[in-house]
């Protein structure tokens, strides 16, 4: 699409040049790059989520605590506690079936098309071609494109949102929070999740312009937030990832999906260097 051409020819080049000038671009690696990637991703993700969803009061994502940790990591990097090793308990992306072959085909095709062109430019005819069915078959199940998109969101978002929330809930009581976050990021940024990452990103972008989509996704986000919030109460007082930083970590993960578009090399980062640790916490609380 034209948008992707502009990203590749202009935006990606400019961002990579800027990062290279700071010594943290695609041609470099290490703790500094990891910290900058984390900081940029957090800002990108928080900006998008806060603009797409109807957050009010303390429900808005405040990335201050995470940004403090990432800034400290640049000046006082902490080596990973474990050596490189194969990812444990890696789970590839699982497409949730509806047990209806035609519906599954249409939702899978919608995910594919939306991930590549966005919701507003995804056409019923293109989705039908991808699914291998006629346009009439779509209108036999759905009133219009909006109802197909709504069903697609309803099938795909809740199970993945639940899994994400459950994964992050484990972080709060983990003896080594950094190791758990490392596994989460390594799994999420794996090739298996690439299409889901793009689909999720395009859906949230569409929510900025569609009240119906925003309302639907906000409901899923609220459920995930409550799960994470309950789990965060069990975090030790001195833990680097507590209520504030744990909730705002949702923005970091989404932001990686944004940064990945302009710098695909971040998918190969050594996530053991993710800047999380007690050394970056002040007075027992992330500031």
Residue ranges and their predicted role:
Residues 8, 26-87, 214, 218, ...:
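Hydrophobic/aromatic-rich alpha-helical bundle segments in the mid-to-C-terminal region
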């Amino acid at each position: 699409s034209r948008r992707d051409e502009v990203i590749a020819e202009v935006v990606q080049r400019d961002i990579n040049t800027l990062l290279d000038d700071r010594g943290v671009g695609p041609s470099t690696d290490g703790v500094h790059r990891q910290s900058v990637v984390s900081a940029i991703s957090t800002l990108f993700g928080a900006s998008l989520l806060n603009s797409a969803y109807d957050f009010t009061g303390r429900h808005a994502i405040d990335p201050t605590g995470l940004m403090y940790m990432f800034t400290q990591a640049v000046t006082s990097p902490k080596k990973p506690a474990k050596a490189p090793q194969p990812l444990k308990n890696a789970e590839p992306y699982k497409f949730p079936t509806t047990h209806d072959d035609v519906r599954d085909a249409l939702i899978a095709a919608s995910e594919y098309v939306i991930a590549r062109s966005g919701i507003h430019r995804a056409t019923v005819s293109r989705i039908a071609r991808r699914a291998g069915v006629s346009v009439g078959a779509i209108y036999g199940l759905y009133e219009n494109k909006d109802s197909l998109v709504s069903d697609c969101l309803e099938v795909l978002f809740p199970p993945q949102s639940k899994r994400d929330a459950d994964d992050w809930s484990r972080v709060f009581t983990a003896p080594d929070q950094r190791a758990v976050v490392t596994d989460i990021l390594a799994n999420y940024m794996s090739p298996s999740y690439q299409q889901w990452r793009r689909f999720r990103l395009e859906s949230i972008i569409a929510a900025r312009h569609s009240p119906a989509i925003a309302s639907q996704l906000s409901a899923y986000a609220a459920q995930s937030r409550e799960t994470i919030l309950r789990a965060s109460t069990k975090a030790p007082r001195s833990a680097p990832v507590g209520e504030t930083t744990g909730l705002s970590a949702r923005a970091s993960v989404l932001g990686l999906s944004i940064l990945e578009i302009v710098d695909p090399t971040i998918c190969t980062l050594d996530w053991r260097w993710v800047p999380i640790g007690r050394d970056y916490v002040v007075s027992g609380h992330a500031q």
